[in-house]
Amino acid sequence: MSCRRVFFNYRALSLGRRCQRSSLRLSLGLIVLFCVLSPLRSFGAEADPKFKPGEELLDAGRIAQAEEFAAKVLKEEPKSPAALDFDARVKFYQGRYAEALAIVDRALAIDSSNQRRQALKLFSQLTLDVHKSLKPFESAHFVLFADEKRDGILVPYALDTLEKTYQTTGAELGFFPKEKVRVEIAPDATSFNAISTLSLRDIEETGAVGICKFNKLMIISPRALSFGYRWLDSLSHEYQHYAIVSLSNNQAPIWLHEGMARFYETRWRKPAPAKDAAEDYLTPANQTLLVHALEKNQFVGFKKMEPSLIYLETPEQVQLAYAEAASAVDFINQSKGRDGVRELLATLNDKATPEAIEKVYGMSFDNFESKWKGFLKSKGLKEIEGSRVRKLKVKKDQREDEEVVELKEIQSAVARNRTYLADQLFAKGRAAAAANEYQRALQASPRSPVILYKLGRIMVETNRPDDALPLFQQALEIDPDNVNIYVQLGRAEHAKKNFKEARAALEEAIQINPFNPLIYRLLGDAYAALGDQEKARAARTTLERLSASRN
């Protein structure tokens, strides 16, 4: 999700959840007032021309200059509620939440009737409440805040990915921020809603699991979602937004924001990317969506992506928009390479997008769109049968949620019913009978990654890893973001003593949902067999930590 537009989503302040936060000590009427207000551009006082330069500095991530601006206006009008509001926002953007709250209280003591000011107090309090459970962890260029007890195992992977992203993004875009970048991992959906303003609907319907906003990167813990999600790529994705805001002075359009973020989000995995690494954005589902868009000439279009992709109507539209935007960045890269991208971002500082495109690439924006579509057609994209846009699900009861979600992903009713029966047989220890039912289900839906994975799991359970491997490989060709497939693939390779391949599969699983203890039991063996005793010890330590947390 983009950080260019800084909106406060009042709808996200769910009445029920807010009422549960007794520490806020707010009246029911005040909470209702906040929930019915329409989205506004910023917190604080009503729009005042004198604060516009400061607002622009904040939105462009120029926090030090915004702080100087706040000091200047406060010196001129030390008792101005509007000046205090702006100073509070600066403190908030610096992560100084308690100070922001105290300053807002001072402004409210002077004028308590301003609704935006009341909302800023509420949001500052919510953020401060969440932050009380988070602990800071630092690396060379980042300060990461996470719940150590629940999400501590994420920290080393997150910081390693962020540092790799810092280097790969710097190499591509020439962006090397000197100040450490603030990152926050929300431990659950309620906390994520509180600090990000993204709602449960935004998570489950549009896949909004991360956001770059308020001068920081925020994601939800993969532990909070059934099956997790590509959380490390999401951290990298949000950092791309952070870079784009700075390099374009917050002037990049949403399609360029989201296109670049999607295009570059996997570069951290490949510091020296292979020739085809640029096409990592073409997941099976995204490629299929683009094929359909080309066939029907039904694109989301760059204009409809404004002001944010979360306002599109369906998950399919959101993912098509990402695919369109990323493919446009692919086209841009192939036109003039990284130098062209850097020049475009710099040109956007003082030119509108159409003029910037014309200056850098020598064509009108209409011509650019036309050539981009021609570029797409020339790629010869093919529909990947069985691929579907994955819908995220906030976890309630892990076992029940996963079983229900998996069954819903099977399109054929016949295959779904047979799979359900096979699941029941497997749960009762009747592996052979379950395998027969999974095979019957596969006859009705031969390209279902869920059924392929479940049948492969039975093969591993019955000591037939050679039969399991092709099933897992076929499933990954359709659904490369399914954590369960990687875990079972790692298990099969481990059974065959293919420890290098097992390590690769299990490390991929960590990138999606690192909370399965089996990952670390198998990884400990794989690392030890490959002679990496330090990583073997680390895997065993993580296993012990996860096991202890479940007792």
Where are these regions (language model features)?
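Amphipathic alpha-helical substructures
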Residues: 64, 93, 98, 272-318, ...
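Helix-start (N-cap) detector for alpha-helical repeat units in TPR-like alpha-solenoids
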Residues: 46-48, 81-82, 115, 415, ...
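Juxtacatalytic substrate-recognition/specificity segment
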Residues: 49, 131-257, 264-271, 279, ...
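Register position in tetratricopeptide repeats
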Residues: 59-60, 93, 127, 427, ...
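Structural marker of alpha-solenoid helical repeat scaffolds
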Residues: 76, 110, 444, 478, ...
